[in-house]
């Protein structure tokens, strides 16, 4: 599955908007309140339409609260009114079919999200469901998953009987896939089941050999951890006593280290758990792909605030890391971190600004953080107080009032220091002007 574009009407802050997507990575940026989460929620409604054709699948709906408000002034009385219909139109590819179109809409406050104009996509899903029932080994199911900002602290309350899921039939790969909050229980249960399988096999054969899919999922987590740390020879195992995932590795000084994943910092824990969840869902959806399941499973993954609790060093590589590990996945993510924005080219960025969606005019890849703040986020790279003093300094310089320019620059140096490149350049400029003026 891949999305090409979405058109939306009357969804939250958007009266009308259209966004097209890169095949691999689309980064949605904007200030807080610009509508980044609204765009991801729109996409979640769209892609989860596929789940309507899968047994046990749960699709996201358009809620009446999602309808855009208009405020009418009636002789001094403000009358807020929801605007209908709310429409989400999508074009994309799925299960070897190109340029499929489907529409979901909500036509009134008391209405339900329509599905009648999504028949082509749900028809493909129903066909896939029949293939699942008949054990078709050639069927490669798309991964669909959404990781919202609640994924770190808000755990999904599991209402299902988890014992009933220990079989992990293929459809279980879609359970809670659209829940913006985290649900690690299913992933941990899968690790537990795979670990017990390997122990059972050891009893039969006398050899301890972990299942191929388990090793593949472990590899995704270990590979990610090594890319963002100085760790070497990393391994992962499920501790049956504590019901936790544990990483063992060599640190940079060669010493052996061992940490449970849930003991790590928020950035490590959040991102490694997310990567593990993606990999485990792939393994459940497409077990016949074996050790190629990470490389060959297609799909759409949505991540709100990809930079959540990440160190800037990992912010710069997280998108390329995800694409390297899961090359057939279309990642649609949001962020306002300069270190994330300058890690991708402008063609993969969509800026949200007062209800408009557009691509940056200038190239973004490799740019310094200050220019990203200034040109993409429309934010000053310095606090307003320092910017005002710098403007005053250059105003005095233009007037050849070097005494006042020196006074203002000295005040700035007291606050910022003398090693800042811009401040050092300003001091050099002032000294040169004084020499030339003598």
Q: Which ranges hold each PLM region?
A:
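RecA-like P-loop NTPase motor core
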Residues: 320, 324, 339-438
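Extended helical coiled-coil dimerization/tether regions that scaffold
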Residues: 173-296, 405
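P-loop NTPase switch/coupling surface
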Residues: 1-187, 394, 417-438
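Solvent-exposed, amphipathic alpha-helical segments
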Residues: 46, 190-197, 281, 389-399
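Amphipathic alpha-helical segments that form well-ordered structural scaffolds
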Residues: 42, 89, 146, 216-227, ...
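Extended hydrophobic secondary-structure segments that form protein cores and membrane-embedded regions
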Residues: 144-148, 237-239, 299-305
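Switch/communication elements of ASCE P-loop NTPase nucleotide-binding domains
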Residues: 1-58, 244-381
């Amino acid at each position: 599955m891949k999305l090409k574009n979405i058109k939306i009407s009357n969804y939250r802050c958007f009266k009308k908007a259209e966004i097209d997507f890169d095949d691999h990575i689309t980064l949605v940026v904007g200030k807080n309140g610009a509508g980044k989460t609204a765009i991801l929620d729109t996409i979640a409604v769209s892609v989860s339409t596929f789940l309507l054709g899968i047994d046990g699948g749960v699709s996201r709906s358009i809620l009446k609260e999602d309808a855009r408000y208009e405020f009418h002034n009636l002789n001094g009385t403000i009358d807020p009114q929801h605007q209908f219909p709310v429409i989400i139109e999508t074009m994309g590819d799925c299960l070897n079919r190109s340029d499929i179109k489907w529409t979901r809409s909500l036509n009134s406050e008391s209405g339900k999200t329509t599905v009648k104009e999504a028949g082509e996509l749900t028809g493909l899903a129903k066909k896939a469901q029949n293939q699942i029932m008949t054990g078709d080994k050639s069927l490669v199911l798309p991964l669909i998953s959404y990781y919202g900002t609640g994924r770190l602290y808000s755990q999904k309350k599991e209402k299902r009987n988890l014992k009933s899921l220990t079989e992990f039939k293929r459809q279980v790969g879609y359970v809670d896939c659209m829940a913006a909050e985290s649900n690690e229980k299913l992933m941990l249960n899968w690790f537990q089941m795979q670990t017990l399988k390997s122990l059972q096999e050891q009893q039969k054969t006398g050899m301890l050999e972990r299942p191929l899919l388990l090793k593949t999922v472990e590899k995704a987590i270990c590979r990610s951890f090594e890319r963002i740390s100085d760790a070497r020879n990393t391994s992962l195992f499920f501790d049956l006593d504590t019901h936790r995932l544990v990483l063992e590795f060599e640190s940079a000084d060669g010493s052996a280290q061992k940490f449970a994943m849930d003991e790590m910092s928020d950035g490590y824990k959040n991102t490694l758990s997310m990567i593990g969840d993606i990999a485990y869902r792939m393994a459940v959806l497409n077990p016949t792909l074996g050790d190629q399941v990470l490389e060959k499973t297609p799909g759409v993954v949505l991540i709100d605030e990809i930079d959540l609790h990440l160190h800037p060093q990992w912010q710069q590589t997280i998108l390329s890391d995800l694409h390297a590990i899961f090359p057939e996945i279309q990642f649609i993510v949001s962020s306002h971190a300069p270190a994330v924005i300058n890690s991708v080219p402008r063609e993969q960025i969509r800026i949200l600004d007062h209800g408009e969606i557009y691509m940056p005019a200038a190239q973004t890849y490799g740019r310094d953080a200050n220019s990203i703040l200034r040109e993409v986020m429309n934010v000053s790279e310095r606090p307003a107080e320092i910017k005002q003093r710098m403007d005053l300094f250059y105003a005095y310089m233009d007037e050849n009032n070097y005494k006042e320019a020196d006074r203002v620059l000295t005040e700035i140096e007291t606050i910022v220091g003398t090693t800042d490149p811009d401040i050092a350049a300003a001091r050099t400029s002032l000294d040169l002007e004084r020499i030339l003026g003598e």
